[in-house]
Amino acid sequence: MSQEKISEIIKDISALKTSCEKLNSQLDELITQKVENEMLLEEVKVLEDDSVLHKLVGLVLVKEEKSKCYDTISRRLQYITGEIENRKKVITNSEEKLRKLFSDLEAHAGQRKIPVPQA
């Protein structure tokens, strides 16, 4: 295996690690949004049915009925939960690709007696 191939594998590992870091950051943000929306949903649940709520749309407060607000938050939670699951799948796939790249690198470095850099 040539030095170019090893350099290419190292470059792929670096790019994939950067991608994984970005995905983990996005996952953290989605989990935070989910927790915030779950708290909001619990607060809306305890309100009386005829309560009038207000939501901020741009710079304007708009009246909204409790049922509509509850439905909106529930749909948002479903969407966020789906996005969390998607990110977890992508992260898992990326981690598997990383493991494969590391094993390829170790195999090629072992053939050439080159120490594997710790990434």
Curated annotation (Swiss-Prot):
Binds specifically to cytosolic chaperonin (c-CPN) and transfers target proteins to it. Binds to nascent polypeptide chain and promotes folding in an environment in which there are many competing pathways for nonnative proteins. Possible candidate for an effective malaria vaccine as determined by epitope response in sera. GO terms for cellular component: cytoplasm; prefoldin complex. GO terms for molecular function: protein-folding chaperone binding; unfolded protein binding. The keyword Chaperone applies. Disulfide bonds: none annotated. Pfam families: Prefoldin_2. Heterohexamer of two PFD-alpha type and four PFD-beta type subunits. May interact with MSP1. The gene is PFD6. Belongs to the prefoldin subunit beta family. It comes from the Eukaryota. Transmembrane segments: none annotated. SUPFAM superfamilies: Prefoldin (SSF46579). InterPro entries: PFD_beta-like, Prefoldin. This is Probable prefoldin subunit 6. The keyword DNA repair does not apply. GO terms for biological process: chaperone-mediated protein complex assembly; protein folding.
